[in-house]
A protein has these predicted regions:
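Helix-to-loop junction immediately C-terminal to a conserved catalytic motif
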Residues: 22
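Conserved ABC ATPase "signature" region
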Residues: 77-95
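Conserved ABC ATPase signature
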Residues: 99-103, 107
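ABC ATPase C-loop
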Residues: 116-117
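Conserved catalytic motifs of ABC-family nucleotide-binding domains
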Residues: 120
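Catalytic Walker B motif of ABC-type/P-loop ATPase nucleotide-binding domains
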Residues: 124-128
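Helix N-cap at the start of a conserved alpha-helix in ABC-type nucleotide-binding domains
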Residues: 135-137
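H-loop (His-switch) and adjacent beta-strand-loop-beta switch element
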Residues: 168-184
Length: 201
């Protein structure tokens, strides 16, 4: 299992590619082939989830079980165990009864990632998971993602964080909806390649 990062300026197609991989955006051409029994878990940008949603942290994480149960069926004991495990894994069990809108940026991002974990997929898609977070929150999420990969989860994340990108196993460099580079981060994220992508904005 591995971590793949999608790197590129705003508007380069990172979020669109994640949406296609998640199955929420239909590709305009080509065919997407996936293996595995479960659909990927998709964690959107924090800004895509409204601050005013009247949800507790636990309720938000429980939404990760909807793919298994549907939004109207009662959660089973196993569902509750899965949700508890996701809350504990992200270190937010003590925040379970808090409203999402009351959380700090880092806490809220961990709640969204916990929702992704509750889906029990072997593919986790993350859109800018550390954008706008302080160093401590970024490091905590980075450590968590490393641990998930060690446990057999494949992680694909869009990021502007070049330090995090250089620590990944593979990198896709995007520009204007096109792939301009792929491979190991040290091969793709060269000074000349980054300069070319960002100077042509």
């Amino acid at each position: 299992m591995a971590t793949t990062v999608l790197v590129g300026p705003n508007g380069s197609g990172k979020s669109t590619l994640l949406g296609v991989l998640a199955g929420v955006i239909k590709p305009t051409s080509g065919v997407l082939v996936r293996t595995g029994d479960r659909p990927p878990a998709f964690v959107p940008q924090r800004g895509a989830v409204g601050d005013t949603l009247p949800l507790t942290v636990r309720q938000a994480v429980e939404m990760g079980r909807w793919g298994e149960r549907g939004p109207w069926r009662r959660l089973t004991r196993r569902d509750h165990t899965t949700v508890d495990a996701a809350l504990d894994r992200l270190g937010i069990g003590a925040l379970a009864s808090r409203q999402l809108g009351e959380l700090s940026g880092g806490q809220r991002q961990r709640a969204l990632i916990a929702q992704g974990l509750a889906q029990e997929s072997d593919l986790l898609l993350l859109d800018e998971p550390t954008t706008g977070l302080d160093i401590e929150a970024r490091e905590r999420i980075g450590e968590l993602l490393t641990a998930l990969v060690a446990d057999g989860v494949t992680v694909v994340q869009a990021t502007h964080d070049l330090e995090a990108a250089r620590a990944a196993d593979a990198c896709l460099l995007l520009q204007n909806g096109r792939l301009t580079g792929q491979g190991r981060p040290e091969q793709v994220l060269t000074t000349s390649a980054l300069t070319q992508v960002w100077q042509t904005l």
